[in-house]
Amino acid sequence: MKHLNTVMAESPALITIFLLGYLLSTECAVFLDRENATKILTRPKRYNSGKLEEFVRGNLERECIEERCSFEEAREVFENTEKTTEFWKQYVDGDQCESNPCLNGGICKDDISSYECWCQVGFEGRNCELDATCNIKNGRCKQFCKNSPDNKVICSCTEGYQLAEDQKSCEPTVPFPCGRASISYSSKKITRAETVFSNMDYENSTEAVFIQDDITDGAILNNVTESSESLNDFTRVVGGENAKPGQIPWQVILNGEIEAFCGGAIINEKWIVTAAHCLKPGDKIEVVAGEYNIDKKEDTEQRRNVIRTIPHHQYNATINKYSHDIALLELDKPLILNSYVTPICVANREYTNIFLKFGSGYVSGWGKVFNKGRQASILQYLRVPLVDRATCLRSTTFTIYNNMFCAGYREGGKDSCEGDSGGPHVTEVEGTSFLTGIISWGEECAMKGKYGIYTKVSRYVNWIKEKTKLT
């Protein structure tokens, strides 16, 4: 024993070796190997364990699920801004497209606290709920609209205009385009033109507007031969307002050898449109354009002689004085267009019907300012609402054919009147005025329960353009 103690005291290295050997011999009883240990206990490894995150490639679970991440951290994972943005929109506040809010086949794109619908062709609106064809709001076109074969809106403009950069608006290409007064006044507008398209729904409207207006030459206006004295040629504006100089530059007055007798409207530099019943064979007619106050010379007037009159080929005064009541006058020399002499616009048949259905046109002239009263000196104008056909038919014992329409006020007091015949009924559309009617006839003037009767211009648009060479 003494010898052993001496050896251990003198040989500490031997003791160390002995202890290590003992421990190694007992390890298998305490620890399992790596493979068996993982079968008993699994624990997710923390990705930031042992290494700096700045030096580890981005991982979506580490960056944005275990912890709240920033956009930049998410960008490290996707390494693409577009993909990161798509993820971020849902990550921040959930998927706004989950309820599928887009209608009519629209594709929903999620955004932060909102969403965006990518609409199919022909639809628009926040949820693609609106028909974007010409049926609704005229396809947002300011004048004419048509649908292409693939249901896209194609806007166009009348003569003297072209499409603006937005492909919706129309801008003039000539100094004095049709239907525009170039002199502006601070007073109120004649009509509420700015609301025309926004308030109209054209779906199936053309069926309601288009009419069967073929009338045989033998058709007779009921009782017209017996009661013609009760019909007054429309030559006045009762209850209207004084126009401003240049406010209605397409208006003309027709002078006979003795006095003025009818009105008319400028179609172009060489042609005037008026009522056929104003014309009498052999009469000499002088047209005065740029007129304002017929009792004064204002140096804006242009006087032209009529060298040819063309009543509509179906007009026959001996059979019916007011059916097809429209005529064209050819001037001896062209008018000089300026701020006081400007033509009215003439649309195609379809759009002339549509514009008429807007329901708010206006008439103008120097006719009598009250029933059986004096003739106006200053050009008058009056807004006249369109009257539905059923009401119009009930208001009179005379036949109202489909080439006519009624406009005016049931309460009376406002109307076109004797002396206004042949003048224009105009509808203003987004700041441009279009011819929609011709003042024709009525029972007395501004009587309660009676309306003014107008020639429906849409029936004669093709004829007007053919004869006056408008394209």
UniProtKB/Swiss-Prot annotation:
<feature type="binding site">
    <location>
        <position position="291"/>
    </location>
    <ligand>
        <name>Ca(2+) 8</name>
    </ligand>
</feature>
<keyword id="KW-0677">Repeat</keyword>
<feature type="modified residue" description="4-carboxyglutamate">
    <location>
        <position position="66"/>
    </location>
</feature>
<dbReference type="InterPro" id="IPR000742">
    <property type="entry name" value="EGF-like_dom"/>
</dbReference>
<feature type="binding site">
    <location>
        <position position="298"/>
    </location>
    <ligand>
        <name>Ca(2+) 8</name>
    </ligand>
</feature>
<feature type="binding site" description="via 4-carboxyglutamate">
    <location>
        <position position="86"/>
    </location>
    <ligand>
        <name>Mg(2+) 3</name>
    </ligand>
</feature>
<feature type="modified residue" description="4-carboxyglutamate">
    <location>
        <position position="76"/>
    </location>
</feature>
<dbReference type="InterPro" id="IPR012224">
    <property type="entry name" value="Pept_S1A_FX"/>
</dbReference>
<feature type="active site" description="Charge relay system">
    <location>
        <position position="325"/>
    </location>
</feature>
<feature type="binding site" description="via 4-carboxyglutamate">
    <location>
        <position position="73"/>
    </location>
    <ligand>
        <name>Ca(2+) 2</name>
    </ligand>
</feature>
<comment type="subunit">
    <text>Heterodimer of a light chain and a heavy chain; disulfide-linked. Interacts (inactive and activated) with F11 (activated) in calcium-dependent manner. Interacts with SERPINC1.</text>
</comment>
<feature type="propeptide" description="Activation peptide">
    <location>
        <begin position="193"/>
        <end position="236"/>
    </location>
</feature>
<feature type="binding site" description="via 4-carboxyglutamate">
    <location>
        <position position="82"/>
    </location>
    <ligand>
        <name>Mg(2+) 3</name>
    </ligand>
</feature>
<feature type="glycosylation site" description="O-linked (GalNAc...) threonine; alternate">
    <location>
        <position position="206"/>
    </location>
</feature>
<dbReference type="Pfam" id="PF00089">
    <property type="entry name" value="Trypsin"/>
</dbReference>
<feature type="modified residue" description="Phosphothreonine; alternate">
    <location>
        <position position="206"/>
    </location>
</feature>
<feature type="binding site">
    <location>
        <position position="293"/>
    </location>
    <ligand>
        <name>Ca(2+) 8</name>
    </ligand>
</feature>
<feature type="binding site" description="via 4-carboxyglutamate">
    <location>
        <position position="67"/>
    </location>
    <ligand>
        <name>Ca(2+) 1</name>
    </ligand>
</feature>
<keyword id="KW-0479">Metal-binding</keyword>
<feature type="glycosylation site" description="O-linked (GalNAc...) threonine">
    <location>
        <position position="235"/>
    </location>
</feature>
<dbReference type="GO" id="GO:0005615">
    <property type="term" value="C:extracellular space"/>
</dbReference>
<dbReference type="InterPro" id="IPR000152">
    <property type="entry name" value="EGF-type_Asp/Asn_hydroxyl_site"/>
</dbReference>
<comment type="function">
    <text>Factor IX is a vitamin K-dependent plasma protein that participates in the intrinsic pathway of blood coagulation by converting factor X to its active form in the presence of Ca(2+) ions, phospholipids, and factor VIIIa.</text>
</comment>
<keyword id="KW-0094">Blood coagulation</keyword>
<dbReference type="GO" id="GO:0007596">
    <property type="term" value="P:blood coagulation"/>
</dbReference>
<dbReference type="GO" id="GO:0004175">
    <property type="term" value="F:endopeptidase activity"/>
</dbReference>
<dbReference type="InterPro" id="IPR050442">
    <property type="entry name" value="Peptidase_S1_coag_factors"/>
</dbReference>
<feature type="domain" description="EGF-like 1; calcium-binding">
    <location>
        <begin position="93"/>
        <end position="129"/>
    </location>
</feature>
<feature type="modified residue" description="Sulfotyrosine">
    <location>
        <position position="202"/>
    </location>
</feature>
<feature type="modified residue" description="4-carboxyglutamate">
    <location>
        <position position="61"/>
    </location>
</feature>
<feature type="disulfide bond">
    <location>
        <begin position="141"/>
        <end position="155"/>
    </location>
</feature>
<feature type="modified residue" description="4-carboxyglutamate">
    <location>
        <position position="86"/>
    </location>
</feature>
<keyword id="KW-0597">Phosphoprotein</keyword>
<keyword id="KW-0245">EGF-like domain</keyword>
<comment type="similarity">
    <text>Belongs to the peptidase S1 family.</text>
</comment>
<feature type="binding site" description="via 4-carboxyglutamate">
    <location>
        <position position="63"/>
    </location>
    <ligand>
        <name>Ca(2+) 3</name>
    </ligand>
</feature>
<feature type="site" description="Cleavage; by factor XIa">
    <location>
        <begin position="192"/>
        <end position="193"/>
    </location>
</feature>
<feature type="disulfide bond">
    <location>
        <begin position="97"/>
        <end position="108"/>
    </location>
</feature>
<feature type="disulfide bond">
    <location>
        <begin position="134"/>
        <end position="145"/>
    </location>
</feature>
<feature type="propeptide">
    <location>
        <begin position="29"/>
        <end position="46"/>
    </location>
</feature>
<feature type="binding site" description="via 4-carboxyglutamate">
    <location>
        <position position="61"/>
    </location>
    <ligand>
        <name>Mg(2+) 1</name>
    </ligand>
</feature>
<feature type="domain" description="Gla">
    <location>
        <begin position="47"/>
        <end position="92"/>
    </location>
</feature>
